[in-house]
Curated annotation (Swiss-Prot):
Gene3D superfamilies: BH3618-like. GO terms for biological process: bacterial-type flagellum assembly; regulation of translation. This is Flagellar assembly factor FliW. GO terms for cellular component: cytoplasm. Belongs to the FliW family. The keyword Cytoplasm applies. Interacts with translational regulator CsrA and flagellin(s). Keywords: Bacterial flagellum biogenesis, Chaperone, Cytoplasm, Translation regulation.
C-alpha cells in the first residue's frame, strides 16, 4: 500500500506498519488508521494518518528523555487494547516541535499506547497525575551574562 505522508513523501507500507485507533485521537476522532514511520538514525517516530497526509504527529518513546516516567493503565484500557503483559505495549508521547528545536515539548499527560502484537492503539489521557501536556524535551540552559 502506498500513502502520501507529511514528512516522508510517498511511502510504501506493509500491514505491520499500520495501527488502528478505534476512537481516533482526541481532536481527530475521524482518523482511525495510522502508520508508524520511524525516522532513521533518530529517536523520533511519525504517527501518520493513512487518509490525510497533513495529519501526522512527531513522537518519541519517553524513557530516553524522561527516565522516571511511568504510567498505570486502567483495566478498561488494557481490555480495549487486548493487553495481556507489559511487553505487548509500545508507549509514545506526542511532541510539539518548536523553533528553535531546543524548545520542543512532550505531552506526558496523554501518551499513545499501542499493542504491538494486535496493532491497535489509543491516546490515553491521564488524570490525577503530575504530568502535563508540555514538558521540555531538553532542560533549559542558563545563559552566561
Amino acid at each position: 500500500m502506498n500513502i502520501e505522508t507529511k514528512y516522508h513523501g510517498t511511502v510504501q507500507l506493509s500491514q505491520l506498519a499500520l495501527v488502528s485507533f478505534e476512537n481516533g485521537l482526541p481532536g481527530f476522532e475521524h482518523e482511525k488508521q495510522f502508520a508508524l514511520l520511524p525516522i532513521h538514525d533518530s529517536p523520533f517516530t511519525i504517527l501518520q494518518s493513512i487518509q490525510h497526509k497533513d495529519v501526522a504527529f512527531v513522537m518519541i518513546e519517553p524513557f530516553s528523555y524522561f527516565p522516571t516516567y511511568e504510567i498505570e493503565l486502567d483495566d478498561a484500557t488494557c481490555e480495549q487494547l487486548k493487553i495481556q503483559k507489559e511487553n505487548d505495549v509500545a508507549l509514545y508521547v506526542i511532541l510539539t516541535v518548536a523553533e528553535p528545536f531546543t524548545n520542543t515539548t512532550a505531552n506526558l499527560q496523554a501518551p499513545v499506547v499501542i499493542n504491538v502484537h494486535e496493532r491497535i492503539g489509543k491516546q490515553v489521557i491521564l488524570t490525577n497525575t503530575p504530568y502535563k501536556t508540555k514538558h521540555r524535551l531538553f532542560p533549559e540552559t542558563v545563559e552566561a551574562k
